[in-house]
Amino acid sequence: MEKLGEDFFTKPTLMLAELLLGKIFVHNTGDGRCYRGKIVETEAYLAEGDEACHAYRGMTKRNRPMYGSPGTLYVYFSYGCHHLMNIVTEPAGVAGAVLIRAMEPIEGLEDMKRNRGLERTVDLLNGPGKLTRAMEITLSHNGASLSGDTVFIEKREDTAPHKICSSKRIGITKSTGLLWRRYVSDSFFVSGKKAGKAC
């Protein structure tokens, strides 16, 4: 199975937030299980001019992966209860990342349901903390490269046409006016209200 390489992720963060929609994220757990989900919602974060970005005030031990190679995972623990998964963008040394907010489940549904304690497929991955729990993404994946065999994005075209919309990001208190959330308008698997405008 071909994977997207580093050249795909070395793009402006806002562009990548849109290009990732429809792409398939894969997590091979190493014990024979595989999780696959189609990305349907993202948010962009940039160090320059974005107070909601973890790297707004510069590099720290926590946000160091954001300055690394594009196509690296930046996973952090939020409010002591959720892991959130971001994909590092921009050239190395420039802090930017795309938060994966929601996916459509494709493979590993029974394990996802067990991990979440839910039966409704539509609710399994419709939130950034929900999808990491369902797909077993933890701090152990922080700094992992998407060019390996454990976590990666499939290199294939999404043949199903979809309308992409933008809106304000969800759950932040700074730089709230930026329309840096992207989502597939007709997806039932997005995390928040489908309020926004077409891109």
Swiss-Prot record:
Molecular function per GO: alkylbase DNA N-glycosylase activity; DNA binding
Entry EC no(s): 3.2.2.-
Keyword tags: DNA damage, DNA repair, Hydrolase
Enzyme class, UniProt record, top EC level: hydrolase
Assigned protein family: Belongs to the DNA glycosylase MPG family.
Entries under NCBIfam families matching the protein: 3mg, PRK00802.1-3
Protein name: Putative 3-methyladenine DNA glycosylase
Classification of source organism: Bacteria, Pseudomonadati, Chlorobiota, Chlorobiia, Chlorobiales
